[in-house]
Amino acid sequence: MKIKVYSLEGEAIDEMELPEIFNEEFRPDVIKRAVLSAQTARVQPWGPDPMAGKRTSAQSYGAGRGVAMVPRIKNGSRAAFVPQAVGGRRAHPPRPQKNYHERINRKERRLAIRSAVAATARKDLVEARGHRIENVPQLPLVVDDELSMIKRTADTREVFRKLGIMDDIVRAREGKKIRAGKGKMRGRKYRTPRGPLIVVGDDKGITRGARNHPGVDVVRVENLNAELLAPGTHPGRLTVFTRSAIEKLDELFQ
């Protein structure tokens, strides 16, 4: 199947053969496993001090005193050590030694990447994620390698407008909301929707040029992963490939 290659002006300048990776079977189950594996690999173990609430000589008086048989401090009636006592240990706390990482086989992870790449060419999946693609000329969108050389935000804004993906960036900007819950107190005050993903063969400045656009991610094709292609385990992210990047896909993820 032939696809068009677009210039920075949004005009078709060439054609190329669509890589075989875009014929991969759609496997949302494998994609979800790969994304969860990447997310859980970043989980930092947490839990209380093993001796918290236990640094006391409190002992139970035993039966026959007419009071509950909980451990009590010496020469007093105050309870200690037990979970229901003030300053006592925690009942069933999180364990630092627990392994949260959901591992995945190497071949399974590569299958997930291939399937997620193929999903970027399906209009129904891209629209189901909420992306605005009314003005996008084709999926997958392939652009000349000059895109990777742009270093200024104003220049990338103009290029994105001509390529038809600016509508999706506006959606991400307008969708920025204050996060619900305590995360807003922990350096994660805002939640921004995911916008377009830019996949380049070689980064010659596009990261600097695109980093101020809300929701936009830039990645070299060698570092492509399932989490970038399917944020939140939902495949079908609006993706822009440079010509050199799309030519390397079959070789890297066969």
Swiss-Prot record:
Pfam family of the protein (one): Ribosomal_L4
GO cellular component: ribonucleoprotein complex; ribosome
InterPro entries, per the entry: Ribosomal_uL4, Ribosomal_uL4_dom_sf, Ribosomal_uL4_euk/arc_CS, Ribosomal_uL4_euk/arch, Ribosomall_uL4-arc
GO molecular function per UniProt: rRNA binding; structural constituent of ribosome
UniProt keyword terms in alphabetical order: Ribonucleoprotein, Ribosomal protein, RNA-binding, rRNA-binding
GO BP term, example: translation
Assembly notes: Part of the 50S ribosomal subunit.
Family: Belongs to the universal ribosomal protein uL4 family.
Function: One of the primary rRNA binding proteins, this protein initially binds near the 5'-end of the 23S rRNA. It is important during the early stages of 50S assembly. It makes multiple contacts with different domains of the 23S rRNA in the assembled 50S subunit and ribosome. Forms part of the polypeptide exit tunnel.
Protein's UniProt name: Large ribosomal subunit protein uL4
Biological source species: Methanothermobacter thermautotrophicus (strain ATCC 29096 / DSM 1053 / JCM 10044 / NBRC 100330 / Delta H) (Methanobacterium thermoautotrophicum)
